[in-house]
Amino acid sequence: MQPFHTLSRILPFPDATQKAWWDKLAPMLLKAMQAQGYDTEAQYAQLGMVYKCVLPYLGQYPTVENDATRWKSFLCPYGIPIEPSLNISQGILRYAFEPIGPDVGTDKDPQNMNVIQDCLKGLTDHDDRIDTTLYAQFASRLLLTKEESQRVAATGQFTFKPGQGMHGYAVDMKGSQPMVKGYFCVGIKSAVTGIPTGKLMLDAVREVDTEGRITEPLDKLEDYYGNALGNLRLCFMSVDMIDPQDARTKLYGLQQEVSFEGLEDLWTLGGRINTPTNQEGLQLLRELWDLLQIPPGVRDIEVDHCSVGQPPKYLLPSLVNWTFLPGHSDPMPQVYLVPFGLPDAHISDALVTFFERRGWTDLARSYKSNLASYFPDVDFSQSRHVQEAISFSFRKGKPYLSVYMSLF
């Protein structure tokens, strides 16, 4: 814990809120980095970026007392504006966050748009390798324009509520060098323009892809989308903030009817992807589904946030993303099994069994103790909220899993 203690002594904190966020977030990230073998330089570099680029934009520190009034993020069931995750197959820690401004939810900033550019500038000033070319092109198409924002505010055409944010960032903590992604949630843009969310994003991707380098996989997704099982709704997208020639574009969807048949439909694009690799991955996905024992059923997509300090009050839909890269004729699926609301002890047992079957002996041995060290205040024999979702993909003959975690 030395980097945390050292930085806590020498860094100035402008207010008690940022210090509270630091005391909650930094130890968890540091313990996870140390468990994954990050060297000391990387630990300091990544915590320094959190301090400089993230803490100023996390808004109120969540408490039971302010839970009813604070701005709640779209990221997590509890409305927490930052969500850590761990790519356990590669040992890479990540976090996604929604920048929140000081005037959010007021007449000065009803749509939480005022700090987008400030936060982005902080990121690019911190790391000049961040390339905003594609991000800017999608932002101009998927965020509210100034005219739309003013019109909505003046006419009351749409009531903005917490959890209906439009943008966010994710940071892959790769050693001492982060890789940043930009996220666009288009539900508000859809409500304002009357254009369905899927069409908004598909049209934007086609417009930005001026050379048609991902037309073929995009056509396959668009053909599938109108015929998908389980009431699939495309709802947000992301783009890597790197050289556009190498950047991945991802489209995300929620599937209301949770079942393995629904996951199979997402994974194979309704039978449109039928490669040996895809089928091999499907077998392992089935194994993970059987181990987690997520109850099948129809889930609500639009739900109220859970209350801090209270256990989960619902189960959630399945989530999926498809990656689009030049040179790939098929969208590359990644599905998210969402056991949020099930006992964390059961989820951990299921994952450890999956690791053991893969021969990941060290991971199987250390997973539970590492997880407990990240959240020392949680009783994992009782909790049902920490391990929110498990993402699964399959590439080059290997499964890749990430665990998404709730800080509160």
UniProtKB/Swiss-Prot annotation:
It comes from Aspergillus cristatus (Chinese Fuzhuan brick tea-fermentation fungus). Dimethylallyl diphosphate binds at residues 94, 181, 183, 248, 250, 252, 334, 336, 400, 404. This is Prenyltransferase criF. Homodimer. It catalyses: preechinulin + dimethylallyl diphosphate = tardioxopiperazine B + diphosphate; preechinulin + dimethylallyl diphosphate = tardioxopiperazine A + diphosphate; tardioxopiperazine A + dimethylallyl diphosphate = echinulin + diphosphate; tardioxopiperazine A + dimethylallyl diphosphate = variecolorin L + diphosphate. Pathway: Secondary metabolite biosynthesis; Alkaloid biosynthesis. One of its GO terms (biological process) is alkaloid metabolic process. NCBIfam families: arom_pren_DMATS. The keyword Transferase applies. InterPro entries: Aro_prenylTrfase, Aro_prenylTrfase_DMATS, DMATS-type_fun. Prenyltransferase; part of the gene cluster that mediates the biosynthesis of echinulin family alkaloid. The pathway begins with the biosynthesis of the cyclic dipeptide cyclo-L-Trp-L-Ala (cyclo-TA) by the NRPS criC via condensation of L-alanine and L-tryptophan. The prenyltransferase criA then catalyzes the first prenylation step, a reverse prenylation reaction at C2, to yield preechinulin. Preechinulin is the substrate of the cytochrome P450 monooxygenase criE that catalyzes the formation of the double bond between C10 and C11 to produce neoechulin A. It holds the Pfam family Trp_DMAT. GO terms for molecular function: prenyltransferase activity. The keyword NADP does not apply. The lineage of its organism: Eukaryota, Fungi, Dikarya, Ascomycota, Pezizomycotina. Its EC number is 2.5.1.-. Belongs to the tryptophan dimethylallyltransferase family. Keywords: Prenyltransferase, Transferase.
